[in-house]
Regions:
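Pre-Walker A adenine-sensing motif
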Residues: 71-80
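Walker B catalytic acidic pair
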Residues: 202
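C-terminal regions of RecA-like/P-loop NTPase motor modules
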Residues: 180-195, 224-234, 245-330
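Structural recognition of the conserved hydrophobic beta-strand(s) that form the central parallel beta-sheet
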Residues: 199, 236-241
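P-loop NTPase nucleotide-binding module
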Residues: 79-124, 177-190, 196-199, 210, ...
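Short, small/acidic-rich helices and loops at N termini and domain boundaries
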Residues: 1-60, 84, 95, 114, ...
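Amphipathic alpha-helical transducer elements in NTP-driven molecular machines
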Residues: 18, 68-71, 125-129, 151-161, ...
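Cytosolic-facing regulatory segments adjacent to core modules
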Residues: 76, 107, 111-194, 208, ...
Length: 330
C-alpha cells in the first residue's frame, strides 16, 4: 500500500518535490519504527499512558517535569521545556533573544547532557561558539574578540572549550534553510543519535515552500510546520521571532501578542509565547538596570506572568536573580 502511494506521489506535477519527498521520508521513518502514521489509538491506551506520565512526574518530586532551562523561576512557571511544545520567543533588537536561547542551550547540552540542535540563520557557527566561550568560561566577550586575555582567562577559556567540545550540541548555520530541509535533518538526528531540543534563530529568516501568496501566509505555514515537527519528534522547539515597530510607539514598551511580526497564525500555533523586555534599554534613569523581564504572554497548559533575570552584558549572559532584587508580581 505504501509503495502504491509513493508511486502515485511521484506522478503528481502540481506539488513541490520537497513536499513529496517529505511525505515519503516520514512514511519510511514510521515504517522503521513499526508504527503507522496517524493511526487511531484506543482510549484505554491513551488513559494508561497519561496515568504513567503523571506517576513519573510524581516520582520526580519536583516542579520541573520537562527539560530544565537553568532559570529557577522560569522553570517553576513552565515546569521546564515540555515535549511537543512550540515555544515562541520574541523581542525587539538588542534585547538578547539569541543570548537567551544560547543560555538555555548551554544548560541543556552542557549540564543536562541532552542533545540540542541550533539552527542559526543569522549568525555563523563560529560567532555562536565565541558566545558560548564567554558564557561557559565567564570571559568578557570583548576580550575574546580582541584576544587580549590574561593567563588565568586563557585557562578558563580552555576549560570552557573542553566542556563545549564534549557536549551533545549540534549547530547548523545554513542561510535561509527551508522547513523541509530542517525537518529532514532533525529526523535524521533523532533517528541516529537522539534529539531532545530544537532551537531556531530566527523564524522570519527561514524559506517557505514558495506556494504562499504572501509573506505573512508563508511565515504562518512555517510556524504550523514547526508545531508539526515538535509533535512528530516529541521534543520542544524554541523559535525566535521579530516584533514589529508598533511597540516603539507606545509609552509602555513591553511587548504584546499583537506586536508579533508577520504574525498570521503564529500565536495560535505556539503553545508558549514569551517576550523579553529590559527597562534600562529605554529608560536610562531606571532603578532596574541590568534586569530583564521574561514575559510569558501565553502558555497553553500553564500560567502566564512575568519572571525576572539578571542581565550580564559583558558575557551576553542571563542569570537567576537574587530574591532581594525581584519585583513582586501584581
Amino acid at each position: 500500500r505504501m509503495s502504491q502511494s509513493i508511486e502515485n506521489d511521484c506522478y503528481k506535477d502540481d506539488e513541490p518535490v520537497s513536499d513529496v519527498m517529505d511525505r515519503i521520508e516520514k512514511a519510511f521513518l514510521a515504517l522503521l519504527q513499526n508504527r503507522g502514521v496517524g493511526d487511531f489509538v484506543p482510549i484505554r491506551q491513551v488513559v494508561l499512558n497519561a496515568l504513567e506520565n503523571i506517576a513519573s512526574a510524581a516520582k520526580m518530586q519536583g516542579s520541573v517535569t520537562g527539560i530544565p532551562t537553568g532559570f529557577t523561576d522560569l522553570d517553576y512557571k513552565m515546569a521546564g521545556l515540555q515535549p511537543s511544545d512550540l515555544i515562541l520567543l520574541a523581542a525587539r533588537p538588542s534585547m538578547g533573544k539569541t543570548a537567551f536561547v544560547l543560555n538555555i542551550a548551554q544548560h541543556v547540552a552542557f549540564h543536562e547532557n541532552k542533545c540540542t540542535a541550533i539552527f542559526s540563520l543569522e549568525m555563523s557557527k563560529e560567532q555562536l561558539v565565541n558566545r558560548l566561550f564567554s558564557l561557559e568560561s565567564r570571559v568578557d566577550a570583548q576580550k575574546l574578540r580582541t584576544g587580549n586575555l590574561q593567563d588565568f582567562e586563557w585557562q578558563e577559556l580552555v576549560e570552557g572549550a573542553n566542556i563545549i567540545a564534549g557536549s551533545p550540541l549540534i549547530i547548523d548555520d545554513t542561510p535561509g534553510i527551508s522547513i523541509s530541509e530542517m525537518r529532514s535533518k532533525c529526523r535524521k538526528f533523532k533517528q541516529e543519535q537522539g534529539l531532545d531540543l530544537i532551537i531556531i534563530d530566527y523564524l522570519q529568516l527561514m524559506s517557505g515552500s514558495g506556494k504562499s501568496v504572501s509573506r505573512q501566509q508563508e511565515v504562518s505555514d512555517i510556524s504550523r510546520a514547526l508545531k508539526g515537527l515538535a509533535r512528530e519528534l516529541n521534543v520542544p522547539v524554541i523559535a525566535l521571532s521579530q516584533l514589529n515597530r508598533g511597540v516603539e510607539q507606545r509609552d509602555d514598551k513591553r511587548p504584546m501578542m499583537s506586536d508579533l511580526r508577520d504574525s498570521g497564525a503564529i500565536e495560535q500555533d505556539a503553545d508558549v509565547v514569551m517576550f523579553i523586555y529590559r527597562d534600562d534599554y529605554y529608560n536610562k534613569d531606571t532603578d532596574r538596570k541590568n534586569i530583564s523581564e521574561i514575559i510569558i504572554a501565553k502558555q497553553r497548559n500553564g500560567p502566564v506572568g512575568t519572571t525576572e533575570l539578571a542581565w550580564l552584558p559583558q558575557y551576553t549572559k542571563f542569570g537567576n536573580l537574587e530574591k532581594s532584587h525581584r519585583r513582586e508580581e501584581e
